[in-house]
Design a protein with these regions (language model features):
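Active-site bordering "gate/hinge" segments
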Residues: 16-382, 387-390, 403, 514-526, ...
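Short, flexible, solvent-exposed loop/turn segments with mixed acidic/basic and small polar residues
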Residues: 4, 169-170, 415-419
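Long, low-charge, small-residue-enriched segments that form tightly packed helices used
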Residues: 135, 358, 376-592
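Hydrophobic helical h-region of N-terminal Sec-dependent signal peptides
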Residues: 6-16
Length: 592
């Protein structure tokens, strides 16, 4: 079929009713090329071919800078300017199109991504030529995928069919701005300087500081009438280190600093203090005893609570849609624990959860989860997800789910099969009944005394986003699944303390959650007055793994500390290599 669908035929194929075009900025050749190609496609018709009903153009004019350093020396430096386009074509109709089936693959059988073909110099002719060819390839792919889907449907009884694509209102916004260059030389110096901190800690085996800076001018246009241009910028500096305890157990810690939309990242002195804190945490963990399997009251302090609740709620507040596979074919598929629970209590009645990507600042904190449109071209709106402990809504992309009429504008990561995955932006977890954190600690002590338990558990930090490698994470997750206990694998606690009846704290290592699920959230007994803001970059990697490639979704979570009536923790069971026999070399310690 592909060989019969020429680029000329494609140009004659696209025909769909459109709203009146909005005026363009006079000097923007990218938007002009997008408009002219879309107008040309709109006016021409060809019989005998599936008709596109939706066409989408995206372009990221992006400068990126990636720097890695360890012990004062640069490991990697990469600075590049790219123009990354994406073209999507959907054929059929909103009710039935080429997406949402197994044969559609990751892009949905109608997405063309041609990074290497776009010129860096502005040329209207070159832009239009590339749009035309990319659209042709996307159209061919969409027609083929749609044909396969219709064959699958002939053999499959779909009991409760859903549309394939939500309709959306057009959104037009042109934000003044330009691509801001990244000062790579300055960042090389700063990154290397922070990495020298770890030379003073011989017990640390591996360490690194990684800088990722992005500056972009984003363009979006679709056949429904949406058109946007806006500048974007995100800089993250990751500090991470790892070592082994005398028994061979791997220990990790990390810190993440993020600046958003041109806001300044932390000063060098603060970054150095952050690296020193990571090193001191590991130094203490090396000397700490191994924790014991535990079931009982657990106090999670505000920062760790934002990590824990951000992960557990963020993974379940959306409903993934299983792609059509056909008779006899199975699809590995992780459903949401909140599916079917609208109207049910999922939290204590004094807790509310709202996601609001429209906010840019709260209590003096810059909210990095703010964005203008999602990957579907939809303007986000605030969503009251949980009210008085009762689940009210899910986050949604333009892939329809049962019982809801539209997108909430949260489709920010690719989910495969032509859909975008809804993820949180700025997640606010608010408690109406609170106590001082010190009072929560006293309540924890009272609970363990009443139960004649020798100690309780306090958690100050999780390894989330995970600082482990992909191979290490796969081993960790496999071990968690094999240990039983139900629930889904959860990020590892990084700083865990035993709390004794006299208030004394003892750091322990080697514990992980067991049997954690959204059902655990109903065991929250109290929350703290104090709250924390947790900023991170979400991605498609497990536990938002640091440095994972692909689409990124900057995210802020605000949460109080929480006291659980009961949680389970168990000893980690991953196999580890023996600690080094030869002592580490003597390193020259230079002042950062």
């Amino acid at each position: 079929m592909k060989s019969t669908l020429t680029a000329f035929a494609l140009a004659l194929a696209v025909a769909f009713a459109q709203p009146a075009p909005k005026p363009l900025p006079g000097d923007d050749l990218v938007l002009r090329a997008m408009r002219e190609e879309m107008e040309r496609s709109r006016q021409l018709r060809q019989t005998g071919l599936e008709m596109p009903y939706f066409l989408e153009y995206k372009l990221e004019d992006q400068e990126s800078c990636s720097i890695g350093a360890s012990l004062g020396g640069l490991l990697t430096v990469r600075q590049i300017h790219l123009r990354m386009p994406m073209v999507q074509v959907r054929v059929g109709s909103y009710d039935l199109d080429n997406t949402n089936h197994l044969a559609a693959g990751y892009g949905g059988g109608g997405v063309r991504y041609d990074q290497d073909t776009w010129p860096l110099d502005d040329s209207l002719q070159a832009f239009r030529q590339n749009l035309w060819l990319a659209t042709d390839r996307a159209y061919k792919s969409a027609v083929e995928a749609f044909s396969i889907k219709k064959e699958i449907l002939k053999q499959t009884n779909v009991t409760d069919p859903l549309p394939d694509f939500y309709r959306a209102q057009p959104f037009v916004k042109i934000v003044p701005g330009k691509l801001v260059p990244i000062n790579g030389e300055t960042w090389k110096t700063r990154t290397a300087r922070v990495s020298t901190v770890f030379a003073a800690y011989p017990e640390i085996m591996t360490s690194g500081v990684e800088l990722e800076a992005l500056s972009s001018l984003s363009y979006y246009m679709n056949s429904e009438g949406s058109m946007l241009r806006y500048p974007d910028a995100l800089t993250s500096l990751r500090i991470r280190a790892a070592t082994q305890a005398p028994d061979g157990m791997t220990l990790r810690d990390s810190a993440l600093h993020i600046s958003f939309q041109g806001s300044n990242i932390a000063a060098d002195a603060d970054l150095i203090r952050s690296a020193e804190q990571v090193a001191n945490n590991l130094r203490a963990l090396v000397k700490a005893p191994v924790g014991e399997t535990y079931s009982g009251p657990v106090l999670i302090e505000p920062m760790a609570s934002a990590q824990f609740l951000g992960y557990l709620l963020g993974e379940n507040i959306r409903i993934p849609r299983k792609p059509l596979a056909g008779p006899g074919r199975s699809v590995p598929f992780a459903s949401s624990e909140f599916e079917g629970k609208i109207g049910s209590r999922v939290l204590p009645e004094w807790l509310d959860v709202v996601d609001d990507p429209t906010q840019t600042e709260f209590r003096g904190h810059t909210l990095i989860g703010h964005y203008l449109i999602d990957n579907d071209g939809v303007q986000p709106r605030p969503v009251s997800l949980i009210e008085n402990g009762v689940l009210k809504e899910y986050l949604r992309s333009r892939q329809p789910i049962k019982g809801f009429p539209d997108s909430t504008g949260h489709g920010r990561l690719l989910a495969g099969f032509g859909a975008n995955q809804p993820v949180i932006g700025n997640l606010f977890i608010r408690a109406r009944q609170t106590k001082k954190l010190d009072a929560l600690k006293q309540q924890l002590i009272s609970m363990i005394q009443q139960r004649n338990k020798p100690y309780g558990i306090l958690i100050r930090k999780l390894d989330y986003p995970s600082s482990a490698s992909m191979g290490e994470l796969q081993a960790i997750i496999t071990s968690m699944v094999q240990s039983g206990g139900g629930g889904r694998p959860a990020p590892l606690p990084a700083l865990v303390y035993k709390i004794y009846p006299d208030g004394r704290e003892e750091l322990v290592r080697g514990l992980r959650f067991r049997g954690v699920s959204t059902r655990s959230l109903r065991d929250i007994m109290a929350a703290s007055e104090e709250t924390a803001f947790f900023d991170f970059v979400n991605n498609s990697g497990p536990f938002a793994m640091m440095g994972s490639a692909g689409y990124l979704a900057a995210t802020t979570v605000m949460a109080p500390g929480v006291l659980f009536e009961e949680l389970e923790l168990e000893r980690s069971q991953e196999e580890s290599s023996k600690a080094p026999i030869v002592p580490p070399p003597v390193l020259t310690v230079r002042k950062p």
